[in-house]
Amino acid sequence: MSRAVHPGTDAALHGKKGEDLRPIWLRPEPGSRRPRFTRDQIAAVAVAVADAEGFEAVAMRRVATELGTSPMSLYHYIAGKEDLIALMDDALMAETVVPDDELPEDWRQAVVTIARRTRGVFLRHPWALAALHGHNAPPSTPISPNAWRHFEQQLAVLVTSPLDIGAQLDLLAIVNDFITGHALRAGEMEQRRNTDPALVQAALEFGRELLRSGRYPFIEALSRSPAGADAAILDEQHSEEQFERGLSLLIDGWCTTQHQDR
C-alpha cells in the first residue's frame, strides 16, 4: 500500500496558493454533464503507456496525446503528475482484489490466492513497485481506495484463522514483503532475458572465471547441480514453483511459531 497522508487541520487541506490538497478521491470530478474522460480512463491510459515504454514515459503531455486532447485540458480532471500517479496506483490495486466467488473458504488457501493474484499484478506491471511504492514514489501519495479494499480482503479471510489480530498483521506484513521481494527478483530476471545476448554471455563467462579461481567452493558445488545450471536460473517455471513453496513455508512456519508460543 502507498504511504498515507494524515493532515492535522482543515488548513492543511489547502496549499499556500489555495490549491486543494485533499486526496484526489475526495475532490469532485469535473462538473460538466458530459465530461470527455473519466479518471479511470486517464489512469488506464497512463498504465498502458508505462507497460509499453516504462514509467519514465508517463507524463501529462504523453497521456493527453494518447487521449486525443491537450495537456491543459487534462488539468481539468487532475491537478498534476502526483494525482496521475495516485490514480495509477489505485488502478493497479484494483487488480489485486480477488472476486468473492474465487476465494477459497479455507483461510490459508485464501491468503495464498490473494498473494498469487497480487504477485501476478506486479509481474504484469514490472515498473510499478519501484515507481509507485519505492523510494522514488511521491511522499504525499495517499493510500488509495482500492488499496484499502485489498487490505480489507486480506483481513477478512483471516477472521476464521486461530491467529489473534497482532499475529494476523504480522503474517500479512511477512507475506506482503515476500510478494514484493519475489516480484522484484522476477522483474530483474525478465530484464536480464531482454538484455543483449552478448552482454548476458559476457556476464556468464565472468562468473565461470570466478568459479574456476577456486575461491568460491560452495558456489562451485551449486553450479554443478541441476538447480544451479544457467538454464534453471533463468527458468520462469522454476521461479513460480519457488514462490509457491516459499509462501507455504512462510504461512505454515508462522502458524507453528504462534502455536508454540502459547
Per-range role (PLM):
Residues 1-36, 217-233:
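N-terminal intrinsically disordered/low-complexity leader segments
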Residues 41, 62, 83, 113, ...:
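Amphipathic alpha-helical interaction segments
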Residues 41, 45, 49, 53-83, ...:
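Helix-turn-helix
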Residues 89-95:
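Short, basic, alpha-helical segments at the C-terminal edge of helix-turn-helix-like DNA-binding modules
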Residues 98-140, 146-149, 175:
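Hydrophobic alpha-helical connector segments
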Residues 113, 136-162, 166-173, 183-184, ...:
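Amphipathic alpha-helical packing segments from all-alpha helical-bundle domains
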Residues 165-230, 241-249:
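Hydrophobic alpha-helical segments that form the core
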Residues 235-261:
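A hydrophobic membrane-anchoring alpha-helix module
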